[in-house]
């Protein structure tokens, strides 16, 4: 079965730099960054038995049944932001815990109902800002809203700078392949320079954010 971008396990491959750049330019256009107070975030359980699964109208416009079902099978949490409810992607889990300032190996063992309750009790203690990334129908990151801690660096802009630097230093460089999933972007170029002939993999990473 063909995967859809809303699914947590989605990935795609690229055979040319143009394909890689076009994909991330389109992704950047369709992504939303929302700044809000940590204390205003509200987490809701979205396990496989949750009544929310059968109530698509409860979610923000544009959220598909596939995104809701996939979330129920993975992280099992939704989040209300500025009055709108979104499924939460697995990639957002660590940054969500960071905003709540909690951690530990016991948390994943909790039921989604209890985990949501714990998160809400902790989140409401903090007045700091959060910077949320909404991408492919889900909340994909819950970063710190303090620009000292986190700044957005779009992958498409990074790729343009990288290609320009390669062209300036290594004439005739050739793009070999690219890969992207919801937590990582990687690409490799073949570089032939003077007496040097080798394959140099150049990798760009993103962890939810942009980079994610």
Describe each PLM feature range.
Residues 152-212:
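Intrinsic disorder/low-complexity polar-acidic segments
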Residues 1-153:
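Intrinsically disordered, low-complexity regulatory segments
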